[in-house]
């Protein structure tokens, strides 16, 4: 996507967006200055204008850490109603903004300085880009005259973030700030959501420099649209494609609704349920879509994929029609691609035309917003039914699915007296002891998969995780952001000991800001998922995966950071610890659950294998195969 030309150090960006999300032409200048008498025009510095623009966009909270190049923007925050959450590491600011966006649907905002601060937010930007999270990131930059001189804390932020943002821009004129901010929020939240970065040189926001003076204005919606002539996301499905999809659905004997995170981004959970019930079609929800369809619904099959349950994986594999809604046929779902759902025709709905046919060629591709397309599909199906078209007999398919569910439920071997604690047991007890609308935030690894498997997600926007990038260290800061966004909800971060050690310092942020998140560490003293692969595929050659159950002492570490620290080592201690944590609501709580390091995540489709080769728990017979 295009951006306005900057100094030669930052070359012009080529069009790369996954949904034609930006501008191929240089960004236009802002709207004409107000025609009111000059004495009544509001004169602001660039820093004041930036904060005022955020206020006008409805920003109530932002996450960040000040530094030299961004200091002029931090000064007007003192006089702003915007709440600023001071993080301990810039990566934490980005993940907090992600967590906030996940649970609210509003763009998360983070702000950091130049150089190493900007590079520290690259991981959250990439994470948000892969999971289509609306984010607006503001970075400081050295003065325009210093760009290209290797000045202190200078880096090519635009170049570095080009491939991990939906749009990025170096602002070179303070008069451009209001329009740039409006564009950023518009691009981040429309079409396929994603992160947008604004790089702000110090001299255009510093009130001590004449070059930062600007005359305040606020662009209208029409002016914003006119400034983005190449950006027109398609939201409604093509009528011909809608009709073809409806006809396929009415003919299918083994259909499955394959639901991805795009359904949640489109706020389409209610429409999805109406479609599933109208057509009596079973639903699988990917890792990014958990909660889009209630797990307690009779048509819910749960999560597919590498660690999905047997029924979800096998129903997709043996279907004759996959109705893919906001999903991208990720390799973790398809397994070996040429063996994936070999008899299935595909209807693929996505807001991003680049996703259609990227992995699996659909018989019916539909570009559009998932909610609008689902509503159009429902109407088209009703019209066909009114004309006398009936669904075929699917009783045999339903009986087959019921047989799989009965034969291959999620299971694990319970701990014998005196044995180590099972992580699945911890999650079951935690699930049953918390409100149904509890927000669960996971890191990456075994604990992430167990959380998605054993929690029952009956409400949308109650599951937050790093799906595409798989970012260790995501859970704690993202949970803090989620709690800021939904202070009325209980928020539990489920983390592994490896993940926790990467970003645990943000619990100091939570304690200082009185953000009472709760953290369950499933501490198996290993990098658990890596250990599992080494055991299963590398002849039990455990290379560099052992951590230690006692270094650090998580209970003492939590207390040192201003949290309540608890430790649980046996099954009979679990309920009391969870109850105590749930009763504390004035500061963060961390529970160190000492779990069995030998426990593995099942089911599992080995990497590179077709989904037919799914491995279930060995207790279910046939050696787990």
List the predicted regions and their residue ranges.
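Thiamine diphosphate
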Residues: 138, 146-153, 313, 357-359, ...
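Active-site diphosphate/adenylate-binding microenvironment
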Residues: 50, 65, 73, 399-477, ...
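Phosphate/pyrophosphate-binding active-site segments
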Residues: 42, 175, 224-228, 343-444, ...
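Glycine-rich, acidic loop regions that bind phosphate or pyrophosphate groups
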Residues: 139-180, 200-202, 289-397
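Glycine-rich phosphate/diphosphate-binding loops that line cofactor/substrate pockets in enzymes
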Residues: 49-59, 100-105, 129, 187-192, ...
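Conformationally flexible catalytic loops at phosphate/diphosphate-handling active centers
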Residues: 187-251, 410-412, 616
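A short, small-residue-rich loop immediately preceding and capping a beta-strand
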Residues: 60-64, 82-85, 103-142, 258-261, ...
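Glycine-rich, anion-gripping cofactor-binding loops and their flanking helix/strand elements
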Residues: 102, 261-347, 448, 458-488, ...
């Amino acid at each position: 996507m295009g951006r306005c030309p900057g100094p030669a150090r930052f070359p012009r960006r080529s069009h790369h967006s996954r949904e034609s999300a930006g501008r191929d032409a240089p960004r236009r200048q802002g709207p004409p200055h107000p025609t009111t008498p000059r004495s009544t025009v509001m004169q602001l510095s660039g820093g004041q204008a930036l904060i005022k623009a955020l206020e006008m966009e409805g920003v109530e909270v932002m996450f960040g850490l000040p530094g030299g190049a961004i200091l002029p923007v931090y000064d007007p925050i003192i006089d702003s109603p915007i709440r600023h959450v001071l993080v301990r590491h810039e990566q934490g600011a980005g993940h907090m903004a992600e967590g906030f966006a996940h649970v609210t649907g509003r763009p998360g905002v983070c702000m950091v300085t130049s150089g190493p601060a900007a590079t520290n937010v690259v991981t959250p930007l990439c994470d948000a880009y892969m999971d289509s999270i609306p984010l607006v990131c503001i970075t400081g930059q050295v003065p325009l005259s210093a760009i290209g001189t290797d000045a202190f804390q200078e880096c090519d932020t635009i170049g570095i973030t080009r491939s991990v943002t939906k749009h990025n821009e170096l602002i070179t004129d303070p008069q451009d700030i209001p329009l740039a901010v409006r564009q950023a929020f518009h691009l981040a939240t429309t079409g396929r959501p994603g992160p947008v970065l604004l790089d702000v040189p110090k001299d255009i926001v510093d009130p001590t420099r004449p070059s930062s003076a600007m005359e305040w204005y606020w662009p209208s919606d029409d002016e914003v649209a006119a400034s983005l002539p190449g950006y027109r996301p398609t939201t409604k499905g093509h009528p011909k494609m809608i009709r073809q999809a409806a006809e396929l659905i009415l003919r299918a004997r083994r259909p499955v609704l394959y639901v991805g995170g795009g359904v949640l981004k489109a706020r389409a959970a209610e429409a999805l349920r109406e479609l599933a019930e109208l057509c009596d079609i079973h639903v699988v929800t990917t890792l990014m879509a958990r909660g889009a369809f209630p797990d307690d619904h009779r048509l819910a099959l749960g999560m597919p994929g590498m660690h999905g349950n047997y029924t979800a994986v096998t129903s997709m594999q043996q279907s004759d029609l996959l109705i893919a809604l906001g999903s991208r046929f990720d390799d973790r779902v398809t397994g070996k691609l040429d063996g994936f759902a070999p008899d299935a025709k595909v209807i693929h709905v996505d807001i991003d035309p680049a996703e259609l046919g990227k992995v699996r060629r659909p018989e019916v591709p539909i570009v559009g917003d998932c909610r609008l397309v689902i509503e159009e599909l429902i109407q088209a199906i009703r019209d066909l039914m009114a004309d006398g078209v009936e669904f075929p007999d699917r009783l045999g398919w339903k009986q087959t699915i019921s047989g799989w569910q009965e034969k291959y439920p999620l299971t694990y071997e319970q701990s014998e007296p005196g044995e180590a604690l099972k992580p699945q047991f911890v999650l079951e007890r935690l699930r049953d002891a918390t409100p149904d609308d509890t927000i669960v935030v996971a890191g990456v690894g075994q604990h992430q998969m167990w959380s998605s498997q054993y929690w029952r997600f009956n409400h949308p926007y109650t599951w937050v995780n790093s799906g595409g990038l798989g970012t260790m260290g995501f859970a704690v800061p993202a949970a803090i952001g989620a709690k800021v966004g939904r202070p009325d909800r209980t928020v539990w971060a489920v983390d592994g000991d490896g993940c926790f050690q990467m970003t645990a310092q943000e619990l100091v942020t939570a304690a200082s800001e009185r953000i009472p998140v709760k953290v369950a560490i499933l501490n198996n003293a290993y990098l658990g998922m890596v250990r599992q692969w080494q055991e299963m595929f590398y002849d039990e050659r455990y290379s560099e995966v052992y951590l230690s159950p006692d270094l650090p002492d998580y209970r003492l570490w939590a207390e040192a950071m201003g949290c309540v620290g608890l430790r649980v080592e046996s099954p009979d201690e679990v309920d009391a610890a969870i109850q105590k944590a749930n009763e504390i609501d004035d500061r963060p709580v961390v529970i160190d659950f000492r779990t069995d390091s030998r426990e593995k995540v099942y089911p599992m489709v080995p990497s590179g294998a077709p989904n037919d080769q799914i491995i279930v728990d060995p207790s279910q017979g046939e050696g787990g195969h």
